[in-house]
Regions:
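Transmembrane beta-strands of outer-membrane beta-barrel pores
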Residues: 8-12, 63-67, 89, 118-124, ...
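Extracellular loop and loop/strand-boundary signature of outer-membrane beta-barrel proteins
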Residues: 29-32, 68-71, 136-139, 185-191, ...
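Beta-barrel outer-membrane channel/assembly domains of diderm bacteria
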Residues: 1-2, 40-59, 136, 153-158, ...
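Outer-membrane beta-barrel architecture
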Residues: 45-47, 84-86, 103, 150-154, ...
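Outer-membrane beta-barrel "beta-signal"
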Residues: 82-92, 239-241, 248, 264-277
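Outer membrane beta-barrel
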Residues: 1-69, 73-91, 110-113, 118, ...
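Outer-membrane beta-barrel and related beta-rich outer-membrane complex signature
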Residues: 16-20, 71-73, 126-128, 174-178, ...
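Detector for outer-membrane/organellar transmembrane beta-barrel domains
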Residues: 76, 86, 94-223
């Protein structure tokens, strides 16, 4: 089957960005998502779903404005082009469980989804698909081409769930450009740059009786020459009580943060009650 979407919506990038913020296993998404996701844009998407034996294939193509969310007028650079493929070798998840975290349906057979996407954004003017506009020393919007490659794995079986993601983003250099902090075509007048580099994140959880889940996550993000974020490792452990699935839950987590340019560690604790209608 084929489905055509048009308008502003989430781009077909990493899985954790596509999962609703109300359907997460921990209090918030990972730093890999925060830094490298391709967020939302205005455009046209073609979604396919085909089955070959027990294997489900989902090819997706998107043509978008390339300016990110809520930019209706003007187009500073060019457009963005995205292709994605999802492979579900063991068939569909119950209740679309490949797009919510935690195995709340307690899959009775192993379910796996593998996905990869690539986005080419022509003349990008923001530090990522959303975020700060970059202005050069002449007072003009910067416009450089960005390549973003994303991949993820989702697995669920009898209360156990695993989500792993990888991301890579780079500027496609033009003639005369160099990855230098002094290159005014790549670093804004405010000292900011595109959020380029790579990152990995892996999280797993087990849903015990009474819908209590213990989960853990490891995250690493590494900038190449970017001035917009700091490289770090994060180690998170969390506990959730799902009262009515993701619609009513209590979640808490604690994270040890190791920033590469800081000899000290920091600790972050979070607690939330979430209600959704």
């Amino acid at each position: 089957s084929l489905t055509l979407w048009a308008g502003q919506t989430k781009m077909p990038g990493n899985r954790q960005r596509l999962v609703s913020s109300q359907a997460l296993q921990l209090v918030d998404r990972s730093q890999v998502n925060s830094i490298f996701n391709i967020d939302r844009d205005i455009g046209v998407h073609l979604h396919g779903q085909f089955q070959v034996g027990s294997v489900v294939l989902r090819p997706i193509f998107a043509f978008a404005k390339g300016e990110g969310r809520n930019i209706i007028a003007n187009n500073i650079g060019g457009f963005s082009y995205t292709g994605k493929l999802e492979i579900l070798p063991f068939g569909l998840f119950e209740s679309k469980g490949d797009y919510f975290e935690a195995d709340l349906k307690r899959e009775q057979k192993p379910k796996l989804s593998l996905a990869a996407s690539a986005t080419y954004n022509e003349g990008a003017s923001r530090d990522k698909q959303t975020g700060t506009f970059l202005i050069d020393t002449a007072g003009d919007y910067m416009a450089n081409n960005l390549l973003t490659v994303l991949g993820d794995v989702m697995f669920k079986y009898k209360g156990f769930s695993l989500l792993a993601e990888g991301a890579f983003k780079q500027v496609m250099l033009k003639s005369g450009q160099s990855l230098s902090t002094t290159d005014s075509t790549l670093v804004s007048v405010g000292g900011k740059s595109y959020q380029t580099g790579w990152g990995v994140s892996a999280q797993a959880g087990y849903l015990f009786k009474h819908n209590i889940e213990l989960a853990a996550r490891y995250t690493r993000v590494v900038p190449d020459w970017s001035k917009s974020f700091t490289g770090l490792d994060e180690y998170t452990i969390g506990l959730s009580k799902y009262v009515v699935g993701h619609k009513l839950k209590v979640q808490t987590d604690v994270t040890l943060i190791d920033e590469f340019d800081n000899s000290d560690y920091s600790l972050r604790y979070r607690l939330q009650v979430e209600v959704a209608f």
